[in-house]
């Protein structure tokens, strides 16, 4: 039976004397604009928030508060909520990649954003329902 050491020695690559290995080119980091849209996925250009900032966040908007807002305000708030959700999920993915435990505050933040988005949808549904019923009422008045 052959020894494995002998076969390993035969398979070894021999490098001739004076051979110079190629040196890889040093690449500089790409320049990224400070206003690049992908920075919206990070708060203060950091992948993870510092522990002192982690638990600081507001509450969800209530439907009563949102009823006073214009459509454009609700539209802007919806996209701010989307951006915040993307930011939170980016942080969550980074924590998973680094094998860190996801803090409870992160889940609470996502819940608050989801509640706000649900309240926005509810207020817009109420407005649509009121518009439809007013339209039907106007039709009934016009036909009688």
From Swiss-Prot:
One Gene Ontology biological process: mitochondrial translation
Organism for this UniProt entry: Schizosaccharomyces pombe (strain 972 / ATCC 24843)
Transit peptide start-stop: 1-68
Protein name: Large ribosomal subunit protein uL29m
Family of the protein in this entry: Belongs to the universal ribosomal protein uL29 family.
Pfam (any one): MRP-L47
Keyword Ribosomal protein assigned: yes
Function: Component of the mitochondrial ribosome (mitoribosome), a dedicated translation machinery responsible for the synthesis of mitochondrial genome-encoded proteins, including at least some of the essential transmembrane subunits of the mitochondrial respiratory chain. The mitoribosomes are attached to the mitochondrial inner membrane and translation products are cotranslationally integrated into the membrane.
Chief localisation class: mitochondrion
Alphabetical UniProt keywords: Mitochondrion, Ribonucleoprotein, Ribosomal protein, Transit peptide
Top-level lineage group: Eukaryota
Gene3D superfamilies xref list: 6.10.330.20
Protein localization: Mitochondrion
One Gene Ontology term, aspect cellular component: mitochondrial large ribosomal subunit
A GO term for molecular function: structural constituent of ribosome
Assembly and oligomerization: Component of the mitochondrial large ribosomal subunit (mt-LSU). Mature yeast 74S mitochondrial ribosomes consist of a small (37S) and a large (54S) subunit. The 37S small subunit contains a 15S ribosomal RNA (15S mt-rRNA) and at least 32 different proteins. The 54S large subunit contains a 21S rRNA (21S mt-rRNA) and at least 45 different proteins.
